[in-house]
Amino acid sequence: QPNDDDARASVESSAEPRLPLLFPAGLAATADRLYVADTGHHRILECNHAGRVLRQFGMGTADFVDGELDHTAFRRPQGLSVARDVLYVADTGNHALRRIVLRSGRVETLCGNGRAGEPVAGPVTSPREVALNQPQSVAATDNEVFMTMAGDNRLWAYDLGRGALACRAGSGQLESRDGSGPMAAFAQPAGLAVVQQTLYVCDALGSAVRSVQLRNDVVQTLVGQGMWEFGDADGPREQARLQNPQAIALSADAPVLWVADTGNGRLRSLRL
């Protein structure tokens, strides 16, 4: 009987793309695959763990096209997240949330019209009529896809069952402030990770790592002192300093967050 790899091989590209990576800005991993957002080439690559390219999603030119495998187009895609054999993509340059059905390779737009605009909470009846504003990172669960929206400094969620958008946290103002829902504020939220009922967010201009409790949308700063209070220091949370953190991931075997402290050129760990 053919296994999943055999079935998937039938839709793999016959040759590896010749272009090197150009500003890769997103990564997602499964037990046997790596997915890379090759941002500068406007494409998504599916690789095995040895680094061999198996499939390319997107023609490699900046455009906004749904459809099958390499007949599709992205524009500066960044954040990636996998859930239930679906790859979710923050298509930043198209101001859209998109998904790739991995078994077939089909690319679909969940919401976004290709232009920056003011997102509106509510049901999404016509995906291409919904405005987003620079979605940068995504984190998917079985039921929701969470997005950091760098262009409007808020955290949004797309409900996969209802097909609806909701703002989970953030006032929209460029600030770094704890609180609940719209009473909280972010300063260009970037990297995102979801663990059970908690979201962890890199607040880039706030030089901070923040948490969001999904039960009540309460935002709390774990590390960071606020906008312009950046630095380069290890130590207890109240003394540690970051600068423009961009990416975050949870350790698989310990309660530790790994943080790409981009402005300092460091990889830091934060014990929860």
Question: Residue locations for each model-derived region?
Answer:
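Short coil/turn segments that connect the beta-strands within blades of beta-propeller domains
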Residues: 31-32, 84-85, 142-143, 196-197, ...
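Short loop/turn segments that connect beta-strands within beta-propeller blades
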Residues: 48-52, 101-105, 159-163, 213-217, ...
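Gly/Pro-rich loop segments of beta-rich domains
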Residues: 1-25, 51-78, 106-134, 164-188, ...
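Conserved beta-strand positions in repeat-built beta-propeller and related beta-rich domains
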Residues: 36-40, 89-93, 147-151, 201-205, ...
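Blade-level signature of beta-propeller repeat domains, shared across WD40, Kelch, NHL, RCC1
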Residues: 244-272
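A short loop-to-beta-strand structural motif that recurs across blades of beta-propeller domains
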Residues: 42-45, 95-99, 106, 153-157, ...
